[in-house]
Design a protein with these regions (language model features):
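Glycine- (often His-adjacent) and acidic-residue-rich active-site loop
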Residues: 65, 206-239
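Short, active-site-adjacent cap segments at secondary-structure transitions
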Residues: 107, 209-212, 258
């Protein structure tokens, strides 16, 4: 009967779980997303949806009880947080296209409100590493166009003037793609700030037409194994290093900010974007979740449901919406 229903009400979801039929949804059931109509909801969903192995998409209007949903969509224009004006079919389609990653992202974000930044970064890295062993990511690696890694002698420029430190991403020839060398250089720069309290402010920019186009695709699939990848990510974590000094950092963004290009800056005390800047989290389409800290940093600016929507759909967010949501503090 469930397979014939495009959406359920809150009582129907409760019946689904209490009746022991929770496995009727999820990747193995061919239903990685469940649309729940929130009209008349009483707030009883969290206990039920916490155990559902699927993305829970709440549909309603601002004012409805929203707890227990991973994503909240409405047809109301300019809805308040945590709603997104969108059609639920976009989330469902994204989950069906990449079910394991979509469900993993939803489950990861459910943990977020109970975790500090460091713990959330650990949880993200573990989830990312797990999905690296998954069939969709392996298929994506096998079918993608091979790219030659372009090494940069100085992937990050660091300059000091008085009490101010300037950090500049310096791979404009590849749209400042985030590679291992850039990560390591950023970690060193942020650790320098942590070690020197006389540095009172940090201005973080990117050279060229784009702040950062995300992870360098030429390096995808080069980690020896997922376990090593996790250990390296947490030993040389730009997110951890940035978190220690975030109160002194202002990020100046422009052009494309993809993946790491917004996941890391979102942690900065202040984020300023140029007109026309865009933002995107494409990782679920690869069979992964954000891996540079996005599930730990972005929700602290825009909330977990809107982060889930960004990550699941991979939609391009324009700068005006980014400001309205609080992902960006100002446009200059």
């Amino acid at each position: 009967m469930l397979a014939d229903r495009s959406s359920l009400t809150e009582p129907e979801v409760l019946d689904l779980v209490s009746g022991g039929d929770a496995e009727a949804v999820g990747p193995f059931a061919g239903r990685p997303a469940l649309v729940v109509r929130l009209d008349g909801a009483t707030g009883a969903l969290p206990a039920a949806t916490a155990v559902l192995p699927c993305v829970v998409v709440g549909v309603g209007v601002p004012g409805d009880v929203t707890v227990g949903c991973d994503v909240l969509v409405t047809d109301v224009e300019d809805p308040p947080a945590p709603w997104v004006q969108a059609d639920p079919s976009a989330v469902v389609a994204a989950a069906e296209a990449s079910p394991a990653a979509a469900v993993a992202l939803a489950q990861l974000l459910r943990l977020g409100p109970r975790l500090d930044v460091y713990s959330a970064l650990v949880a993200e890295s573990l989830t990312y590493g797990l999905l690296q062993s998954g069939p969709m990511y392996r298929e994506w690696l096998a079918t993608r166009r091979k790219r030659q890694h372009v090494a940069s002698t100085r992937p990050v420029l660091v300059e000091r003037e008085g009490t101010q430190l300037s950090i500049t991403l310096n791979r404009p020839e590849v749209r400042n793609a985030f590679d291992v060398a850039m990560r390591d250089a950023l970690v060193e720069a942020f650790r320098l700030v942590a070690a020197d309290p006389s540095i009172t402010s940090v201005e973080w920019r990117g050279d060229g037409d784009n702040f950062c186009s995300g992870g360098d695709l030429a390096e995808f699939g080069t980690v020896p194994d997922p376990v090593t990848g996790h250990l390296v990510r947490m030993s040389r974590s730009a997110g951890v290093a940035l978190a220690a000094v975030a109160d002194r950092v202002t990020a100046y963004l422009h052009g494309a900010c993809v993946g790491a290009g917004i996941e890391l800056p979102a942690l900065a005390h202040r984020v300023v974007a140029a007109p026309g800047t865009t933002f995107r989290l494409p990782e679920v389409t690869f069979g992964l979740v954000p891996g540079a800290g996005g599930t730990a940093t972005i929700p602290r600016r825009i909330g977990w449901p809107r982060t889930a929507w960004l990550g699941l759909t991979g939609v391009v967010l324009d700068v005006d919406m980014a400001v309205a949501w609080g992902l960006v503090d100002a446009v200059e």
